[in-house]
Each structure stands twice: as structure tokens, then as C-alpha cells.
Amino acid sequence: MSELTTIARPYAKAAFDYAVEQKIIAGWQEMLVFAAQVAQNPDIKNLMSGAVAPESLAEIFNKICGEQLDQHGQNFVKVLAENKRLQALPDIAELFSEFKAEFDKEIEADVTSATELNAKQQADISAALEKRLARKVKLNCSVDPTLIAGVKIKAGDTVIDGSVKSKLNRLTDALQA
């Protein structure tokens, strides 16, 4: 876990709790994603690492974001600037998205297969994961021919490796033991 992630967690949690309370989770997620993109701009990064006063930095940042941030979003940026935490915005946005996924009972699953999966195979994998994890699953599919055959699935802390490559590696280890 990076230092910025540790710094970002309480800010992301506070923003998420506020968004839940006000029933504006999607709006806050959009604001944070936009602000994170602005914070990753090389010119803005230079500005944030310079000797600009926090009030001025917040004002400049909010002007750049324009109408993408509502009054509460602008206040959030001011608090981050005053505490010299604007550089944590990308991590804050990422953590906010994780909190939202947990709240919505959603999870992203990375599915790697030896060949491209068709729509039915993707639907079958998604349904099986939803049943096993008791969550709505969004698949991120990729192809890795080195798997030989089968699939490798990673969803949160759960890893399911049904690839031939993995089975061959286990067999090799067993024979060498």
C-alpha cells in the first residue's frame, strides 16, 4: 500500500460517507474522477509541488475544474489544498470507487483466457462468479496464449486458476518433489 493511499483513505471515506448521506454517490464519483484527472496533468503536478500558497492552489484548481465541481466538491479541494493533500486525489478517487463498489455489492473480475471468450462463455463465467461471490460482477477479459487452454480469474482476493499451464506447473512440481 502506497503512502498516498494511506493518506487518501480518510478523505475518500469522508467524501463517500457524505455522498451516501446526501444520496449523490454517482455525482461525487464523477467529480472525484474529473478532479483526479486534473491532478495528474503534468503542469498541475508541477504547480502542486511548487511553493504556491494553499489558498491560491485551491482557487486555481477549482477554476480549472470549473462547473465539473459543485460547491461541496470545491470545498473538498480547498480542504485537500490546505492540508497539502491535492496530490492524493487520484488515490482518493480510486478508493471512493472501491467504497462505491462495496456499497453497490459489485466487484470487477479479471478473466484471462488462452483464446477469446464468446458472449455465452462470458455470461456463464459472470453468472457463476455472481453466485459464488454474492455480488454483481463486471468482467475485464483479456487473452494470454501462454495459458495453453482454460481460464484464470481474479476477483478481489479470490483467484481461480483453471489454466492448463497452471496444471502442468503443479504436475511438474509434484514430479520433482
Swiss-Prot record:
Which InterPro entries does this one have?
ATP_synth_OSCP/delta_N_sf, ATPase_OSCP/d_CS, ATPase_OSCP/dsu
Coiled-coil spans are: none
> What cellular component terms from Gene Ontology apply here?
plasma membrane; proton-transporting ATP synthase complex
Q: What is its main location?
A: membrane
Pfam families recorded for this chain? Answer: OSCP
What membrane topology does this protein have? Answer: Peripheral membrane protein
Q: State the source organism's domain of life.
A: Bacteria
Q: Does the keyword Membrane apply?
A: yes
Keyword field:
ATP synthesis, Cell inner membrane, Cell membrane, CF(1), Hydrogen ion transport, Ion transport, Membrane, Transport
The listed locations are: Cell inner membrane
What SUPFAM superfamilies is this protein classified in? N-terminal domain of the delta subunit of the F1F0-ATP synthase
Q: List, in alphabetical order, the Gene Ontology terms for molecular function in this entry.
A: proton-transporting ATP synthase activity, rotational mechanism
What NCBIfam families does this protein's entry cite? ATP_synt_delta (TIGR01145), PRK05758.2-2 (NF004402), PRK05758.2-5 (NF004404)
- Cite the record's note on assembly: F-type ATPases have 2 components, F(1) - the catalytic core - and F(0) - the membrane proton channel. F(1) has five subunits: alpha(3), beta(3), gamma(1), delta(1), epsilon(1). F(0) has three main subunits: a(1), b(2) and c(10-14). The alpha and beta chains form an alternating ring which encloses part of the gamma chain. F(1) is attached to F(0) by a central stalk formed by the gamma and epsilon chains, while a peripheral stalk is formed by the delta and b chains.
- Functional summary from the UniProt entry: F(1)F(0) ATP synthase produces ATP from ADP in the presence of a proton or sodium gradient. F-type ATPases consist of two structural domains, F(1) containing the extramembraneous catalytic core and F(0) containing the membrane proton channel, linked together by a central stalk and a peripheral stalk. During catalysis, ATP synthesis in the catalytic domain of F(1) is coupled via a rotary mechanism of the central stalk subunits to proton translocation. This protein is part of the stalk that links CF(0) to CF(1). It either transmits conformational changes from CF(0) to CF(1) or is implicated in proton conduction.
Which family would the database say this protein is a member of?
A: Belongs to the ATPase delta chain family.
Q: What is this protein called?
A: ATP synthase subunit delta
Provenance organism: Pseudoalteromonas atlantica (strain T6c / ATCC BAA-1087)
Q: Kindly list the organism's lineage.
A: Bacteria, Pseudomonadati, Pseudomonadota, Gammaproteobacteria, Alteromonadales
Gene encoding this chain?
atpH
